């Protein structure tokens, strides 16, 4: 129980340190707006908390606005702002309706006006005006998710199928200025890829999109194929962008929490980008290599793994990472691995991630659960639920990638 208690404290402290509220307030100090209208558009999993912070700072200057976040992530009204919840990771009808409202609010603005655009991860699904039939867009998104395409590859395709992605939302807002505050959820903070870059010049090309479509065998209608050949904006003169929050801050906060609990933290990487199972196996190997240590150690890896779906089970990349590690640390005393999505949701589940220790494999075996078979069916959620290994945080109000931690207590 000691290791699980340590895990829960690390999670709580790390998430508290990466809330976007303070960063939004800093960005809005001095009220950096012109004399015209100011319209707020907040999009993403952290949209509600970012919008609340903005209203605390400049609420008196706002001439309306809209918040678009994931189902279950809104926490109540914010002044006169429209609050909308929509589908993630696949856009739904709520996504399309809310985006149309945002486009209407920002239509017909003048050069004296400003759009305060608050953007966080998840925006690729939550902010969408498709240039192809909605059903085809949803099918393409599902195909990319199932194939294990990474976030950059997914967004390269989605930009070209959208009227708001890849800088096209900023074009729509022109000649108004777009003042954009971005919470990063992609390794390296590429502004044109975060939420598919609605208000940032696009660095990807049509050739990139064609290559990705061929690589993953996407079935595209003639209409969608034509969209891949239409280039996105490469220059936007009406946009000012500030980036705040990233996986680096999440790792630093988790490291500080580990140190406060008596562990010596070791940051392995803040650019983790591989199969979830590979990451879990790697952390297990690190655990075995350091069993002779005479001091408590915490090894941290931040980033975002991927999962290639081979089964029909339920889970997410963080749960799959943790369960993969369970096999490798089986029998190791005072050793645990946990992995967490900072937004509080891991895959299409109500869990944020998973926790395993040296006894997890044996506890599952006593229930007739074999880890290899579970992973083959991508059913980590039910296995972790059976052994008390699910991590639940609820919606966190932030979204800065994932962090996985190996704890060795001495």
Which residues make up each language-model segment?
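Internal gly/pro-rich beta-alpha loop/helix module
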Residues: 133-222, 228
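Internal helix-turn-beta structural module
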Residues: 323-410
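Accessory alpha-helical/coil subdomains and C-terminal extensions
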Residues: 158, 176-179, 201-282, 286
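Glycine-rich oxoanion-binding loops at beta->alpha junctions
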Residues: 69-112, 153, 157-158
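Active-site segments that bind and position negatively charged phosphate/pyrophosphate groups
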Residues: 262-339, 347-348
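N-terminal amphipathic/basic leader segments beginning at the initiator methionine
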Residues: 1-37, 41-42, 49, 193, ...
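A glycine- and small-aliphatic-rich helix-loop capping segment at beta-alpha/alpha-beta transitions
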Residues: 53-62, 80-82, 103, 130-143, ...
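Short beta-strand segments
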Residues: 41-43, 66-69, 116-121, 180-186, ...
């Amino acid at each position: 129980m000691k290791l699980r208690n340590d895990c829960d404290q690390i999670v709580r402290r790390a998430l508290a340190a990466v809330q976007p509220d303070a960063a939004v307030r800093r960005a809005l100090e001095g009220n950096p707006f012109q004399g015209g209208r100011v319209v707020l558009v907040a999009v993403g999993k952290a949209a509600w908390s970012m919008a609340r912070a903005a209203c605390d700072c400049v609420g008196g200057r706002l001439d309306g606005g809209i918040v678009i976040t994931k189902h279950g992530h809104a926490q109540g009204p914010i002044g006169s702002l429209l609050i909308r919840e929509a589908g993630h990771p696949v856009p739904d009808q709520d996504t399309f309706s809310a985006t149309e409202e945002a486009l209407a609010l920002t239509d017909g603005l003048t050069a004296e006006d400003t759009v305060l655009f608050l953007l966080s991860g998840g925006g690729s699904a939550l902010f969408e005006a498709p240039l192809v039939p909605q059903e085809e867009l949803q099918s393409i998104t599902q195909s990319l998710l199932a194939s294990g395409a990474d976030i950059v590859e997914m967004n390269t395709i989605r930009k070209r199928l959208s009227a708001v992605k890849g800088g096209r939302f900023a074009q729509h807002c022109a000649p108004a200025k777009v003042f954009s505050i971005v919470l990063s959820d992609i390794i390296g903070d590429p502004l044109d890829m975060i939420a598919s870059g609605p208000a940032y010049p696009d660095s990807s090309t049509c050739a990139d999109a064609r290559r990705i479509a061929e690589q993953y065998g996407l079935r595209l209608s003639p209409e969608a194929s034509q969209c891949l050949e239409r280039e996105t904006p490469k220059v936007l003169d009406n946009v000012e962008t500030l980036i705040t929050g990233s996986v680096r801050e999440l790792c630093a906060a988790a490291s500080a929490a580990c140190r406060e609990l008596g562990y010596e933290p070791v940051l392995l990487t803040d650019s983790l980008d591989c199969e979830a199972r590979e990451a879990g196996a790697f952390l297990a190997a690190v655990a075995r290599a350091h069993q002779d240590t005479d001091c408590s150690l915490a090894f941290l890896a931040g980033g975002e793994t991927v999962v290639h779906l081979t089964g029909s089970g339920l889970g997410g990349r963080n749960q799959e990472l943790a369960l993969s590690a369970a096999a490798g640390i089986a029998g190791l005393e005072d050793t645990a691995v946990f992995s967490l999505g900072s937004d509080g949701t891991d895959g299409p589940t109500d869990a944020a991630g998973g926790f395993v220790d040296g006894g997890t494999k044996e506890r599952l075996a006593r229930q007739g659960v074999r880890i290899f078979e579970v992973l083959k069916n991508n059913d980590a959620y039910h296995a972790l639920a059976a052994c008390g290994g699910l991590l639940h945080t609820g919606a966190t109000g932030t979204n800065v990638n994932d962090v996985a931690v190996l704890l060795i207590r001495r």
